[in-house]
Amino acid sequence: KKELKWNEKPFIIPTNLLKIWRDSANRNNKTYAQSKKKSSNINGLKNFPKEIEKLFDVIAKEFKNFNTPQATRKSSEAVLHYITNKMSLFGGSADLTGSNNTKGKQMEILNHKNYNGQYIHYGVREHGMAAIMNGIAATKLYKTYSGTFLSFADYMKPSLRLAALMKIDPIQVFTHDSIGLGEDGPTHQPIEQINMLRLIPNSYVFRPCDMMETVACWKVALKIS
């Protein structure tokens, strides 16, 4: 206190600081009211269940005879190209978009130059990414999904657990889920992560093995609420 030249009595807030705090609150209240008014006009997820059934009927027919061997993250990307163009989805990845294959073709990047984007490049911030997606999912205006390697689910655990406790429905796309993958060595090769995820109450874990299972997993995941 001496170094900061703070001479106020304990538990006393100086009047000038209190004014700054209250001015900030009033300013933010106005922004909040404007945001709430704008969001009330967004259709959001009102017609989501009907959209899912119709769209996935089309997707299932499209890929019914698909039998080319490919990584399920590529199958997931093919599904995402369909659904992100038709639904209110908000996506992102923790510095692994090119590896997770989580960005739909039509999705714009959200950044300081474009606040209308539906996709965020989070950088190496798995926990922050999951926390932000929880917040967006809690608005009920968007279905959210985010991607990283399965081995990095450990970094997201607090946010994953909170999503389950809050009974919200963000989707996590965990790729490279095999000990046979990962040229970067053991840090990128998941062992115990699947068991950890399956032990979280009020959570669902799907591991598709081919194109049609990937289609089915996306459909079920989007219907969970």
Regions found by a protein language model. Give the residues of each.
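Histidine-centered active-site/metal-ligand motif
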Residues: 1-2, 7, 176, 188
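Conserved phosphoryl-transfer catalytic core
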Residues: 2-19
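Thiamine diphosphate
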Residues: 19, 24-225
